[in-house]
Amino acid sequence: MLGFEKAADKYLTSWAYWMYKAFHDHTTTAAENQEGIFNPDGTLQSYKEKALSRTYIQYYQGEPLEVFFNDETSEFFARFKYDGSIEEPSVLYLNKELNYNNGYKLDITDDKGNKIEEVELEEKENYIYFKVNRDKDEILIVKITLTPF
């Protein structure tokens, strides 16, 4: 599953996990008792829950260029080309309980690593909304780095 997720990140594509519970599907590549997200006793397979709770950006205030999530450390990185004509914020999803239970550091910088000061930021539950307020015609690459404590 993790290999598929990394490939989806590399090619900036979305994905969905559809095997909710075991159906004894002979076409699956999973080993016995590994189909679905639940164990045979009905408990959640925690490693799959963590694998499926990756940090990602749902909406970009521009064009996505690159995204990476480290499954072991939960560090997240993304780059996008800023489009000042977009009035809505970018929306980042993060699972605080599974990946950032001790908190996190969010950095929003340009491609050279300089902090972008003109940012409206709002955090709600497992979402971070951020809107860059720079000149609408400015050519700007925005880098997002989320690092767990």
Give, region by region, the residue ranges found by the protein language model:
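Beta-strand-rich ligand-recognition modules
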Residues: 118-149
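Short, solvent-exposed loop/linker segments at beta-strand-coil boundaries, enriched for Pro/Gly
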Residues: 110-117
